[in-house]
Amino acid sequence: MNRAADDLIASHLARSHAAMARAAQDTALLASAGRIAAKIVTALRSGRKLLIVGNGGSAADAQHIAAEIVGRYKQERPAFAAIALTTDTSALTAIGNDYGFDHVFARQVEGLGTSGDVLLAISTSGRSPSILNALRKARERGLTTIGFTGANGLAMGELCDELLVAPSDDTPLIQQIHLATAHGICETIEAALMQDLS
């Protein structure tokens, strides 16, 4: 690897470290994350489920978070219900073909979501039509709505019961903050649910 590549990677790591440090000191983000964990715990304790949506890298995050809830984060425990609505290629392509991509998640929320469930919608920009439509449909169906976005995505909050805002406008850094915070939320959820079993 040449020096220029080393410098680019080092620069990214330095910016990533600084962004994580800002997030760790962001009292609004931390408070929001705690409330989000509590809302998800309430739903899972009641036998409800967590639905998760996102596009691109946020779709990967949706799958990652669902895996932590259904599988386990760190502790051996019963499985809990979480579904990433980003994984069913037949549903995604059928809905996209018949209704348009803007409705690929809303249609699934309509079919799978019930009152008392939670929708976690991840959008770094806060402006993705497919994500906003999913939130609207979730509201119609009585789901608790949670959003993850970046510094420029505050308008998304109008559709969310709780909005977590990563303190950055750089998409890769927003994604890193989202996933790191999601891990903290998963650990909090797991600790609360494990306490129920003790």
From Swiss-Prot:
Known catalytic reactions: 2 D-sedoheptulose 7-phosphate = D-glycero-alpha-D-manno-heptose 7-phosphate + D-glycero-beta-D-manno-heptose 7-phosphate
Entry-linked InterPro entries: GmhA/DiaA, Phosphoheptose_Isoase, SIS_dom, SIS_dom_sf, SIS_GmhA/DiaA_subfam
Pathway assigned to this chain's UniProt record: Carbohydrate biosynthesis; D-glycero-D-manno-heptose 7-phosphate biosynthesis; D-glycero-alpha-D-manno-heptose 7-phosphate and D-glycero-beta-D-manno-heptose 7-phosphate from sedoheptulose 7-phosphate: step 1/1
A Pfam family: SIS_2
Necessary cofactors: Zn(2+)
SUPFAM superfamilies with a match to the protein in the record: SIS domain
Domain SIS: residue ranges: 40-198
Primary residence: cytoplasm
PROSITE patterns listed in its UniProt record: SIS
GO molecular function, one term: carbohydrate derivative binding
Cofactor: how bound: Binds 1 zinc ion per subunit.
Gene Ontology CC annotations of this record: cytoplasm
Subcellular location: Cytoplasm
Chain residues that bind Zn(2+): H64, E68, Q175, H183
Annotated substrate binding sites: N55, G56, G57, E68, N97, D98, S123, T124, S125, S128, Q175
CDD domains: SIS_GmhA (cd05006)
An annotated GO BP: carbohydrate metabolic process
Family under the similarity heading: Belongs to the SIS family. GmhA subfamily.
Task performed by this protein: Catalyzes the isomerization of sedoheptulose 7-phosphate in D-glycero-D-manno-heptose 7-phosphate.
Other notes: The reaction produces a racemic mixture of D-glycero-alpha-D-manno-heptose 7-phosphate and D-glycero-beta-D-manno-heptose 7-phosphate.
Protein name: Phosphoheptose isomerase
Naturally occurring in which organism (per UniProt): Bradyrhizobium sp. (strain BTAi1 / ATCC BAA-1182)
